[in-house]
Amino acid sequence: MSKPSQASQPLAVQPVYLAASAINSVIHALPAGTAYGIGVVLITMFTGQLVHHQGSLARAALPYVWQLRWGWHRVERAMERGKVVLDVLFDRAFTWCFECLPAEPVRLGSEQRTVHAIDSSTVVRLRANKKRCALLGKGYCQRAQRAVQANIVAALTTVVLIRGIRVGLVRRTRFGATCQEAVANVFAALPASPEKRLFCVDAGIATIEQFRIATEHDALVGRLRKNVTLRRSPAPKLSGKRGRPALHGPVVHPGVKRPEGRPDEDTTVRLEDREVRVRRWHNLHFRETPRTRIDVVRVDDPAYNRPLLMGTTARELTTAEIRIAYSHRWPVETNFYVAQGTCAMEMPRAWSATGVERRISLALLAGALLKTIAAACAPLPMGPWDLKAVSSAGRLANHLSLHAQNFATLALHGLTPRKYRKINIAKKPAELQLPLAA
């Protein structure tokens, strides 16, 4: 008696094919020699081998280029001298995610604004020579608890949903001597978009200057300092009263224990087993920018010692939407963690401006792609002990390292490394006059 056939199961998305397709589509527009080298770099980052070799690109790339003459040197040369425009790579990766993955942009408010997050990270370079290493600045190191010399990078991330999982797609990276300079460079290099946008930032980035340059098209929402001082709108000028109309109204300190006056909204929200008080003030402004109106939301949660202050220029958002918008800031920090732990962002091993910029930017790009591909695939357990596996970038990198050869073959499909040959030009001997015989 024949055994009954098993019920057909839905085919799962193969992460190896997705990751290989992502790399192939990103690098296919580059020149042939450069594309092969950059592809090998991305493969070492996707598989976590660059972290395993402590950031040594030559050792990590050697298994993929051993058959080539000067193989690892070609990879290093592509990173230092290849014709690569990072913004083009970011745009191609962004397009690939929407074409090949079930990605949907997060939208908020009646204006249906797309949500973007901006944050900065400090890549510590304690042993780097100041004269030799480029793009060095000063940044605070949490581990050392002091300011150290470092490469400071700021990243712009677009927040999307993939199968209900919130992830961030890196769109731009910029560097600077300080965090403020790097963030300002990111704001100056924003990609053009016909849709209205909402940028989520943290307290160090939500400065008065950033609120001032925010527009109706590109609004800003960010956390404010606890000691921030704001002004209410002035009372309307009475008819017949002499003098100019007032620019500022009463002073408001929304972060103190008892703010002045009454808020425009005062509600209580039930979260799990506790009640959270939420207050909102309309049409406030900084003393330095009286024409820039913002709404401020204060959240008093019993689980935290300090209140959470959020300000936004998108005043059409409801109080609940402002709280949701600020929570969308976390994907950009997740990209930094993935790039550090899986793609060796903290170990650039580069000293020129081009090398530092490409090593750190490609690590952020690889980390974001790992996170998005993992969200689109089924959970990948590390072993029989991993009973509660989740869709994470680290598990995906471990899976790709187990299939590294097949993954590299698919990722570099259609790309042929440039063949170098030594050109021997026979030099003609100089026709010198023979010396006269004695």
Q: What are the residue ranges of the model-derived segments?
A:
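Extended, non-catalytic structural segments that build the interaction scaffolds
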Residues: 40-50, 304-329
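A short, flexible helix-boundary coil/loop motif
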Residues: 1-40, 48-49, 64, 163-175, ...
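Short amphipathic alpha-helical "interface-anchor" segments enriched in bulky aromatics
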Residues: 322-350
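Electropositive, glycine- and tryptophan-enriched low-complexity nucleic-acid-binding patches
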Residues: 68, 74, 139-196, 296, ...
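Short, positively charged, Gly/Tyr-enriched micro-motifs
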Residues: 11, 22-99, 159-166, 197-199, ...
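Domain-level cores of phosphate- or acyl-group-handling catalytic modules
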Residues: 177-237
